[in-house]
């Protein structure tokens, strides 16, 4: 797969072999043509400006980064069959972090107002995390373990873990790395289409060559892994591509295997299914 991706990128670069600009220079020109000025909201109210100055400062960013890391460490300290005291401390810490992140949301709402706050997708994500965390705290307080009609709060406890994703919005370096990761997926659809075509071709060939092999439990060609139907053939090929017991599948598809009772084999040819082509396949 890596070789296919590298070859695809090289073929794309070959289209510009006669261009006087290299790849970085072309990207700079495209960026200059597509760039748009960024609008930054600065409040005119002096009290609102003071709050805005605090929440946009690097010290505030470092503080929230520290709180997120501390929250992550606290989540990592939880373990199976922990004591009641540990559960109590975890609940208290969860409430404390929820209050702090709620305070951050309120300060940003006061600094940017609703329009400016919700104009940033990261702020919308933070807002959803805070709301989910508040619901988690409320349900944790009203949930009674001895009550048969207790509320399931497993889903809302996922918001505790989702706070870690907030780290992606902290720091220019992290955002640059995330943007680079997203941009690397631009060529992925074409590579994925090529891989799908290869799987399709190989699945059809496998159905023709190994589709008559009997499904025997205890072997690699069974009711779950076989070439008798197209979906099963694709799944089996995917298993081979991941390297899971591919050599055993190879041997079970070689010549001399028992034929499926419903296949059209002649009398005395019960063990003539499979082919040596499996070694090349």
Swiss-Prot record:
IV repeat residues: 45-281
GO MF annotation terms: calmodulin binding; voltage-gated calcium channel activity
Any GO BP: calcium ion transmembrane transport
Post-translational modification as stated in the protein's UniProt record: Both the minor and major forms are phosphorylated in vitro by PKA. Phosphorylation by PKA activates the calcium channel.
Intramembrane segments: 233-251
Subcellular location: Cell membrane, Sarcolemma, T-tubule
UniProt-annotated glycosylation sites, renumbered to this chain: 81
Reaction catalysed by this enzyme: Ca(2+)(in) = Ca(2+)(out)
Region: Phenylalkylamine binding, residue numbers: 270-281
Gene3D superfamilies: 1.10.287.70, Voltage-gated potassium channels. Chain C
Cellular component terms (Gene Ontology): L-type voltage-gated calcium channel complex; T-tubule
Membrane spanning stretches: 59-80, 89-110, 121-140, 153-171, 190-210
Keywords of the record: Calcium, Calcium channel, Calcium transport, Calmodulin-binding, Cell membrane, Disulfide bond, Glycoprotein, Ion channel, Ion transport, Membrane, Phosphoprotein, Repeat, Transmembrane, Transmembrane helix, Transport, Voltage-gated channel
Major subcellular location class: membrane
Domain remarks in the Swiss-Prot or TrEMBL record: Each of the four internal repeats contains five hydrophobic transmembrane segments (S1, S2, S3, S5, S6) and one positively charged transmembrane segment (S4). S4 segments probably represent the voltage-sensor and are characterized by a series of positively charged amino acids at every third position.
Name the UniProt record assigns to this protein: Voltage-dependent L-type calcium channel subunit alpha-1S
């Amino acid at each position: 797969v890596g070789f296919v991706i590298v070859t695809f990128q090289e073929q794309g670069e070959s289209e510009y072999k006669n261009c006087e600009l290299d790849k970085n220079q072309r990207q700079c020109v495209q960026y200059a043509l597509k760039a748009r000025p960024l609008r930054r909201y600065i409040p005119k109210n002096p009290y609102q400006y003071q709050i805005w100055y605090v929440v946009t400062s690097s010290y505030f960013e470092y503080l929230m980064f520290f709180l997120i890391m501390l929250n992550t460490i606290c989540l990592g300290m939880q373990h199976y069959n922990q004591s009641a005291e540990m559960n109590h401390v975890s609940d208290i810490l969860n409430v404390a972090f929820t209050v702090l992140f709620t305070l951050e949301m309120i300060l940003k709402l006061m600094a940017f107002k609703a329009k400016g706050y919700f104009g940033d997708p990261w702020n919308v994500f933070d807002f959803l995390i805070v709301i989910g965390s508040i619901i988690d705290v409320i349900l944790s307080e009203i949930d009674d373990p001895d009550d048969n009609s207790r509320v399931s709060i497993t889903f809302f406890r996922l918001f505790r873990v989702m706070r870690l994703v907030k780290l992606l919005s902290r720091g220019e370096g992290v955002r640059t790395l995330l943007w680079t990761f997203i941009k690397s997926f631009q060529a992925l659809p074409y590579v994925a289409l090529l891989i799908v075509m290869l799987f399709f071709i190989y699945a059809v060939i496998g159905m023709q060559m190994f589709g008559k092999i009997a499904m025997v439990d205890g072997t690699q060609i069974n009711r779950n892994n076989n070439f008798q139907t197209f979906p099963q053939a694709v799944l089996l090929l995917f298993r081979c591509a991941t390297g899971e017991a591919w050599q055993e599948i190879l041997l079970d598809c070689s010549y001399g295997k028992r034929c499926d009772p419903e296949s059209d084999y002649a009398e005395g040819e019960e063990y003539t299914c499979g082919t040596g082509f499996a070694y090349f396949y």
